Amino acid sequence: MKKHLIATTLIASFFTLASAEEIMVSAAASLTNAFTDIAKNYEKAHPEDKVMLNFAGSGALLQQMENGAPVDIFASADQVTMDKAIEKKLVKADTRKTFVQNTLVVIVSTDSKLDPKNLEDLTKADVTKIALANPASVPVGRYTKNVLEAAKLWQTLEPKFIETESVRQSLAYVAQNETDTGFVYGTDAAVLKKEVRVAFTVPTEQPITYPIALTTDSKKGSDRFYDYIFNADSQKILEDYGFTKPE
C-alpha cells in the first residue's frame, strides 16, 4: 500500500512538472508595478508556473521580439505597436484584447516652484528641460508629440526636450530634478507621489488604451496567465494603480 502511494505521488508530480511552464511576458514599462503584483498572485495560485517579466518601452519590446527574443505574452501601451506586431505575425490577432486605459499628464517634482497649468506654460523661460520618451519607439512620446503638434507647440518646445527610453525614465528624471517637468502617464505619477505631483492632465484626441495578446510562438500554458489578467482580482490591482477600464 505504501509503495502504491509513493508511486501515485511520483506520477502526479511528474505530470505537474510536465505541465509546468516558464511564461515570458513583455509589457510596457507603465505596467511594471501592476503586472509584478499580478504575477506574484498568479504564482501563488499556480505554483507549477513561473512568470518572467520584461518591461521596457513598447517599441523596444517589439524590436526584441523581431530579433527573436522568447516571448509568450505581449502587452503594449498603444494600439499602433500592437498593429505592427500583428502585421509582422509576431502575435495571434484573434487573442488581441484591449484591457486598460490611461491618461497623459505633465508632472513636476514635489519641491519644484514651477506650477504650469497648461501646455502654453511650458513655453515660459523658467521651464528649460522637459523629459519626453522617444516618440519613435515609446507610445507616451508619440501621444505627446501628436498633442503638441495639434497645439502647434512641438517646434517651440522641441529644444527643451530631454529624450528618454521609457516613461519610467522620464518619471525618474523629474523625481530626481534632472528635468523641470515631464510627460508621463497618470499611473506613473501615482507610483512616486512623494517625489512628483501632477501639474495638469493633457487631453488626447484618442483614449490611451493598452492591448494584450499571445505571441505566435507562445507556449501551451501561457493562456493561463493571459486569462488571469482579466479576472476580478487582477482587474482590481490594475484599478488600484490608476488604470481604468477601456471606454
Give the ranges of each region predicted by the language model.
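Exported/periplasmic ABC-transporter solute-binding proteins
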Residues: 20-45, 52-55, 59, 63-67, ...
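Exposed boundary/loop context
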Residues: 13, 50-52
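Gram-negative bacterial Sec-dependent N-terminal signal peptides
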Residues: 1-19
